[in-house]
Structures are given as structure tokens and as C-alpha cells.
Amino acid sequence: MRHGKSGRKLNRTTSHRKAMFANMAASLIEHEQIVTTLPKAKEIRPIVEKLVTLGKRGDLHARRQAIAAIRDTEKVAKLFSALAPRYESRHGGYLRIMKAGFRTGDNAPMAVVEFVDRDVNAKGATDHERKVAKVTEKEDS
């Protein structure tokens, strides 16, 4: 019987699932918006919302718990310095999940996960810089 069992397995082992959620949380904190499948989006929401709550707490123990969860000190620094002050007056509900149609190929339901009051410049800025650097590198060769 599955009484009291919560969460989806997503056809992955426990360690793979934990690593995937850590990577997704880090990407969401960095870019403030990600596109993923709807079941993954529904699973990542409570994880990231708890991380933002840790950021709002702001003490050393909360910082260490956040580092243990996502394993990226740069993202944790952004969480505590940029995201936590932004959501200081908001009690939960930091993320928005919007359905984004179906993926070509396997028809999987897709979703956009984003922070409610996100910085629109956070998404794509580093990606654009990386792309420009790659293009100039190809032209130089």
C-alpha cells in the first residue's frame, strides 16, 4: 500500500532524482526561469520555495543547509543576497508554474517555472554572452 507516500519517482533512482532536483534548483536560481516537463516542475516547486525560505532566514545554519541542498556556493550567494531580500515581505508562493504546451517528439506536457517577481535580465544574459564568445572564437580560428 502506498499510504503516506508523496512525490514522484520520475523513472529515476533516488540519487539521480536528488542530483537532478539540485541541478534544476541551481538553474532556476541562476536564470530565474526554466522550461521543463510539468511533473518535474510540480516536484521542484516545494524544493526551491524551501530554499528561498532558508535564504530569508539568513543565518549561517540556513546557508549551510542551502549549500547541502544545491551544492553551488555561487547560487547560494545569489539566493541569500538577491532573492531573499526581494521576497522578504512575501509569505510563500515565490514560484509560478505556467503550462507551455507539449514537447515535439514525445508529446510530454511542458511547463515554464519562474520566480513571481523575477529579474527579466537574469534569463538569457549569460547565455547570450556565451554564444557571442563562441561565435567570435569561431571567427578567429
Swiss-Prot record:
The UniProt keywords, alphabetically, are: Ribonucleoprotein, Ribosomal protein
Q: Does the keyword Ribonucleoprotein apply?
A: yes
Task: Offer one Pfam family short name for this entry.
Answer: Ribosomal_L17
Give the UniProt entry's GO cellular component terms: cytosolic large ribosomal subunit
**Molecular function (Gene Ontology), one example:** structural constituent of ribosome
Presence of keyword Ribosomal protein: yes
List this protein's GO terms for biological process: translation
Q: Which Gene3D superfamilies match?
A: Ribosomal protein L17
Q: Which cysteines are joined by disulfide bonds?
A: none
Name the InterPro entries on file. Answer: Ribosomal_bL17 (IPR000456), Ribosomal_bL17_CS (IPR047859), Ribosomal_bL17_sf (IPR036373)
Q: How does it assemble?
A: Part of the 50S ribosomal subunit. Contacts protein L32.
| Record-stated family | Belongs to the bacterial ribosomal protein bL17 family.
Q: What is this protein called?
A: Large ribosomal subunit protein bL17
Species annotation: Bartonella bacilliformis (strain ATCC 35685 / KC583 / Herrer 020/F12,63)
